């Protein structure tokens, strides 16, 4: 299985710069996209061999996620299963017999951390959502998590030092594996 994830920061502009060619060249089973910045009906994206599944933000020109998939899923879910966070087009989940494929665009805390309370609330809801999926079958999560796990992941760590420790704690807790295998993240996150 091959999956690609890309924050396009506006799919319409990206289409004019060879998006379809990239999909064809890479030929993934799943192409997960964040920040589509589209509303329903604004774009007819037809790529041979793929079906698209979208979660649109209510706010025009904002957020949005999409998965292009070669095989049809058993089910499709939009959002993270909670009303407070269901209006920004942040998550598409496709269910298959052996796994869930999830694309996610996490909210940014923004300058001055003015959206930090919303971000923390989103993270808690996301943790519950992913744990619920993981209790049923494995989860493959692709996306832009808007998080730096350690200081080395930041271009300018000085002013962001406190945020790194906050996000490091969240990502370690959220992504610690519930099942251990050769591909577990436990050694990466500890």
Kindly give the residue locations of the regions a language model identified:
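N-terminal, active-site-proximal structural segment of metallo-dependent hydrolase catalytic domains
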Residues: 1-47, 57, 62, 78
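Surface-exposed cleft-lining segments at the edges of enzyme active sites
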Residues: 81-82, 106-123, 156-163
């Amino acid at each position: 299985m091959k999956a690609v994830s890309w924050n396009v920061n506006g799919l319409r502009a990206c289409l004019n710069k060879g998006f379809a060619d990239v999909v064809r060249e890479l030929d993934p089973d799943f192409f997960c996209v964040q920040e589509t910045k589209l509303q329903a009906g604004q774009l007819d994206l037809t790529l041979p061999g793929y079906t698209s599944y979208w979660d649109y933000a209510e706010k025009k020109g904002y957020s949005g996620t999409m998965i292009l998939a070669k095989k049809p899923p058993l089910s499709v879910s939009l959002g993270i299963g909670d009303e407070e966070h269901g209006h920004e087009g942040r998550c598409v989940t496709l269910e298959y017999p052996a796994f869930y494929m999830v694309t996610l665009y996490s909210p940014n805390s923004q300058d001055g951390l003015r959206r930090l309370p919303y971000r923390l609330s989103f993270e808690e809801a996301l943790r519950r959502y992913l744990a619920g999926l993981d209790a049923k079958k494995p989860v493959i999560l692709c996306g832009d998590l808007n998080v730096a796990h350690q200081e080395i992941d930041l271009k300018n760590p000085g002013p962001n030092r406190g945020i790194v420790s906050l996000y490091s704690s969240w990502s370690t807790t959220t992504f610690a594996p519930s099942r251990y295998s050769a591909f577990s993240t436990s050694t990466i996150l500890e």
